[in-house]
Amino acid sequence: MLLTAYFVLVGLIALWAVLEFSACHSKPSTSSNAVGNPAFRQFQYDFYRTYFPALAADWLQGPYLYKLYQHYHFLEGQIAIIYVCGFGASVFAGLVSAPLTSRLGRRKSCILFCLLLSASYLCKLSQEYFVLITGRVLGGFSSSLLFSSFEAWYTHEHAEQHDFPAEWLPHTFTRAAAWNGGIAIAAGVIANACAEWLGLGPASPSVLAVPLLVLSVALVIREWDENYGQTSSFRRVCGDGLRCLLRDRRVLLLGTIQALFESVVYIFIFLWTPVLDPHNTPLGIAFSSFMAASAAGSSLYRLATSKKYHLQPMHVLCLSILMVFFSLFMLTFSTAPGQEHPTESLLAFLLIELACGLYFPAMGFLRCRLIPEKEQIGVLNWFRVPLNLLAGLGLLVLHDSDYQSGTRNMFSLCAITMLLALLCVVSLFTMVRNDSELRLPTSETEPNGTEQ
């Protein structure tokens, strides 16, 4: 598995490069004015050099999080509880992050993210179980602030402070998404180098991330001005979101699909390490391969929905769910006790990540078109609750460290979950197949389809 993982990573990076090149040349550029504006380029650069260290710090923990808890000799059931606490924190933080960011200020929220994530990483140096749970809870809170705070600050400054055209926003976030893929791949390799090549142990990537967060905080304090969003009562936001869900069956189906799909992804995040680690798989390299597969999926989405191929986001969404179902079906066989096939499991995991790269932009496009902008925060809050509950219950109920086939049973249940998601997609498709609002124009792909 050692050499296989390295070859797979190189191949996936090459595939991503080819797909990204093809996607970039599949339609004419709509941002030539933005690229040629020196003030805009400088503003972008100032944002990126603050945002990217925070992204890198967030990614560095990914490859060795489960391994760290194993290194401290906790059982899989105990590790599952730590993860569930993180999911619970994400549920609560998801509900309050938007109003908190608006009231506290985006600049202060970015600083708060860095402080919370730093504290979370420092907690990982302790072997005390409740300290580790505290660290996971802090990590759950901080993850909800990452994208909402930084991107909300940039969007406000772009329009209000610098008065740049709104159509230039996708240029910034498209580039950020591409860089985010590269940063995630590099983070996996660096984490692998620290933990395995240098023999510093599974806690070392988290320690390495803290200086990056300090750098991000220093740049935010020195260079960014404060800005605030419109404040709405929490009850009103959630009430409006619930009414939108109940009055529009399409939104309810879309939320069900999101909860089913993403809860399976959360369980996959928990399971990939115990499946691959016993077979001498370099975890950082495997993580980088996952990120390369996801980035390739995002590039493939842009290519598939371009004017050259004319696929619609609904078709891509259906394809991504089919891919995950097939992957989970593979995993029920490749993880059978006494008959494990780690190479097949790795390929199945990579297919899941490729599907995620297709799923998220497709779901983002449909969400943007189906849910009114003023109600999106409230609706997304309601989406998050079943998502995290399904993931948490799946880990608590199904995973028994004393039962050899527990992992296989989890994949079987996840496959059934994806089958339910597929039925919801078919039901949604029958409702909206003639709805031109949910179709990309045949002349060119709209930027909103890849930015959500």
UniProtKB/Swiss-Prot annotation:
Mediates high-affinity intracellular uptake of the rare oligo-element molybdenum. One of its GO terms (biological process) is monoatomic ion transport. The chain crosses the membrane at residues 1-21, 45-65, 79-99, 130-150, 180-200, 201-221, 251-271, 281-301, 316-336, 346-366, 377-397, 410-430. It is a multi-pass membrane protein. It comes from the Eukaryota. Gene3D superfamilies: MFS general substrate transporter like domains. One of its GO terms (cellular component) is plasma membrane. Keywords: Cell membrane, Ion transport, Membrane, Transmembrane, Transmembrane helix, Transport. One of its GO terms (molecular function) is molybdate ion transmembrane transporter activity. It holds the Pfam family MFS_5. It is found in: Cell membrane. This is Molybdate-anion transporter. Belongs to the major facilitator superfamily.
